[in-house]
Amino acid sequence: CAFGCPFEGEVPVDAALRVVDAYAALDIDRLTLGDTTGMATPPTVSRLVQAIAKRFPQMRVALHFHNTRGIGLANVVVGLDLGVREFESSIGGLGGCPFAPGATGNVCTEDLVYLLEESGFETGIDLGALIAVAQRVEAIVGRTLPGQVMKAGPRLRKYSLEGAKRAVG
């Protein structure tokens, strides 16, 4: 976990850079920074991604965030602002971490795609189909999943006025 450990605390940037040094020595030019424990924050993401970019400008960085404290997408925005273009996520936010107390699921794919599209990034992903898949997965696992876009839909989703009147009563 690049952004914090529930047993050892903060992961110093220098410690993470030593790991990246080892990868770079093997001519690895792409790595994923994992937030498996859900401890990343926008400032910790910024510090580590900037340090890697400064020391290893050839290194492509991908980011893997959990939404444990509700700031997974805020961390994505920081990554986007720093030039990161690869992110890992899961349908409906499925996932977790069995060894990290309190850790919850990953950033929801449908929420991530919605954020990217609304921010002007072309993903090539059919958001409507993705939402349908997330809703189906929720039914299969038999519990409410944390995805927001799968519940609310895109911001410009239109509803019938008659349906709204019936819902209000």
Label the model's feature ranges.
Residues C1-G169:
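Catalytic cores and adjacent flexible loops of soluble metabolic enzymes
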